Amino acid sequence: MAIKQNGRAHLSSDIDFIRTPEAPVDSLSTGKNPGVPSTNSPAIKNAPLPADGPGYEQWSNGFLVAALLGIPQWLSWKLGGGLKTAIFLSIFTTIPVLAVIWTVMSRYSPRINHDVKLPGRPVEFYLTFKSDSHRARWTGTHKIPMATFFELYFTGQVDLNGDALEVFEYRHDWATFNFTSETFRYILFTFFPDVVLHLRSQDEEQVRTNYDSGNDHYAWFLGPRMIYTSGIISDPTREETLEEMQDNKLAIVCEKISLKEGDTLLDIGCGWGTLAKFASLNYGAKVTGVTLARNQVQWGNDGLQQAGIPEEQSRLLCCDYRDIPEDQKFNKITQLEMAEHVGVRRLTGFFRQCYDMLENDGSMYVQVSGFRKAWQYEDFIWGLFLNKYIFPGADASTPLSYYVGCLESAGFEVKSVDTIGVHYSGTLWRWYRNWLGNADKVKAKYGVRWFRIWEIFLAYSTIGSRQGSATCYQIVVVKNLNSNHRIDGVYSQYGLHGALAAAKAAGKNMLPK
């Protein structure tokens, strides 16, 4: 796959950025009330059918544990054995029992609620299969497992009857979210080994395979800011541009850590260096950005140079986070959606490394994606899709409590947390439209399969982050030391300031006499 332009990585001057296209018209709408109130904000893709699927409410951890322990015990009893025999048999029964229970529960559990009324259209209204066997198997009310659909769509064996995002808005009408045999094979032989190992060589290969796909590839949906993290909506009553949303986010990051002139800032997983440039120009910070992707470093350092920022002030380095000298101290540290690539097993150690590199009076901004505890089976199917096709090796998307626990175990104190899932949905909606607008270029260079994988990723992620399947957290932490002057942090507790300002503006900030 070519990633070079005239012998070097693509730089901003090589890219013809487009203006984000208008959103496609919903041609699948029933025109009927879905059964629940809907939104009408121009800032996001509003949901026409926000249905809940089966999930945690029908799940029983007690039943699972009983089956895992009881079946080998029962087999041992039938064979005339004892506890040691049961333990030995459990080696062979654990995975089959897990597979059977997850398959049955994901296939036959009812929806959490039926507040949203599904249109009840046949599968063929939404999908056109290329083979007779597929048409015969998935027709009428016989829905296709979503995991199966992915591979059929990417290999051209099925087409969507409309815009991908719109068809996915009605996915409960044509798809199920049950686990398949292929799902378990992937979990067992790819996902779990990645989670357990997370070797340095493995991380390097996965990151470079992903983020060194080609700067042009990312430019075709990220736009001129080249930021692969969520932007921020400042006004839900209008459709801000992608660039406005990303500038909003960059300003918020800098303000939340009270960045000031002369501060040394370490940006771990710096991407194409846009935050480094923003912080250098607007705040006079001295920024060191690190990433494993060579193309990102070339793009970012070129951007710093074009902006007139001397290398002595700010620069990007191509290195592993584990190679950052721990004896070097920084006033501030930022990491935007990088921790997911560290792995759940290594998070606390990674945060401790950050702790050791941070000045005692410094602060760290952590932006991480997460999943809800009140899960639905769809969330798992979507998460595995991300791991398989988009972010190989990224397994650290967890509920908020896990991140907080890791940060506190590393010695930090949480100063603030904001949930920005709906902002991510708005960002992804714009990325999706950019991707469609560059469809011909993508297909010509990377092929139809590649285009379709990212088409579904961006479309489905727009929905997932809007409905809560996944979200994103902005967490600001400081060192939990007695000598920390916490009063200085009051100035940047913007959640408190915003709430109080709203009350004052409404004249509701005092108890009436």
Swiss-Prot record:
GO terms for biological process: methylation; sphingolipid metabolic process. One of its GO terms (cellular component) is membrane. It is found in: Membrane. The chain crosses the membrane at residues 63-83, 85-105. It catalyses: a (4E,8E)-4-sphinga-4,8-dienine ceramide + S-adenosyl-L-methionine = a 9-methyl-(4E,8E)-sphinga-4,8-dienine ceramide + S-adenosyl-L-homocysteine + H(+). Its EC number is 2.1.1.317. Disruption phenotype: In contrast to the knockout of its paralog MT2, has no effect on methylation of GluCers and exhibits no growth defects. However, a double-knockout with its paralog MT2 is not viable. GO terms for molecular function: methyltransferase activity. It comes from the Eukaryota. Keywords: Lipid biosynthesis, Lipid metabolism, Membrane, Methyltransferase, S-adenosyl-L-methionine, Sphingolipid metabolism, Transferase, Transmembrane, Transmembrane helix. The keyword Cell wall biogenesis/degradation does not apply. InterPro entries: SAM-dependent_MTases_sf, Sphingo_C9-MT. Pathway: Lipid metabolism; sphingolipid metabolism. S-adenosyl-L-methionine binds at residues 228-229, 265-273, 291-296, 321-322. It is a multi-pass membrane protein. Its main location: membrane. The keyword Transcription regulation does not apply. Belongs to the CFA/CMAS family. Catalyzes methylation of the sphingoid base component of glucosylceramides (GluCers) at the C9-position. Sphingolipid C9-methylation requires 4,8-desaturated ceramides as substrates. Glucosylceramides play important roles in the growth, differentiation and pathogenicity. The methyl group at the C9-position distinguishes fungal glucosylceramides from those of plants and animals, and may thus play a role in host-pathogen interactions enabling the host to recognize the fungal attack and initiate specific defense responses. This is Sphingolipid C9-methyltransferase 1. It comes from Gibberella zeae (strain ATCC MYA-4620 / CBS 123657 / FGSC 9075 / NRRL 31084 / PH-1) (Wheat head blight fungus). The gene is MT1.
